[in-house]
Regions:
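Long, charged low-complexity intrinsically disordered regions
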Residues: 1-172
Length: 172
């Protein structure tokens, strides 16, 4: 017996990552169409990267359309992005894209992109959760492939045994 302390942000990150990865592998990513496409300007080298990886980005739910010489319209995003700053996330993604379309490098970078998007969309550490939300998070976490670590490898929960706790209170 003891007390299990769960980091809600890391736990939710694992849940989102597993869902997103599974959806990505099944090519069934839930997307959100933007009511007003986001116009973003890029450097010529970034435009080249985006054109090269447009199909792969589409598989992640990011629908881009070249608009003029150095601009893209972002038409859809993965539904898990919710209200996050889509332009900032796109900038991070562009920075992560490999220079070549080498399959192994692309797979590795997309793994990093999935992790980043999951992290950005996870419940924040200081956010209060009610009992139902806590139960749902723990239930969802138990259904993941690796419920003990986040995609970065950090532990999700720590178990403090009762004897250690009692010693802290000078009871043993």
């Amino acid at each position: 017996p003891g007390i299990l302390v769960v980091d809600q942000h890391i736990a939710h990150e694992r849940v989102l990552y597993d869902r997103f990865k599974k959806s990505s592998e099944n090519k069934k990513i839930e997307v959100q169409q933007l009511l007003f496409p986001l116009t973003m300007e890029y450097s010529p080298s970034e435009v080249e990267l985006l054109v090269r990886h447009k199909g792969s980005l589409s598989e992640l739910g990011l629908e881009l359309e070249l608009f003029g010489k150095n601009e893209f319209l972002l038409r859809t995003v993965p539904a898990i992005l919710k209200n996050n700053d889509k332009e900032e996330i796109m900038r991070e993604i562009v920075d992560m894209l490999p220079a070549q379309k080498h399959e192994e490098a692309l797979h590795e970078k997309f793994e990093e992109i999935l992790i980043m998007m999951s992290c950005r969309n996870a419940i924040k550490v200081n956010m209060s959760l009610n009992l139902d939300q806590i139960r749902k998070l723990i239930s969802d976490l138990q259904e993941t492939e690796m419920p003990y670590t986040c995609p970065h490898g950090r532990p999700i929960a720590l178990l403090y045994d009762i004897d250690s706790i009692l010693k802290k209170f000078l009871r043993k």
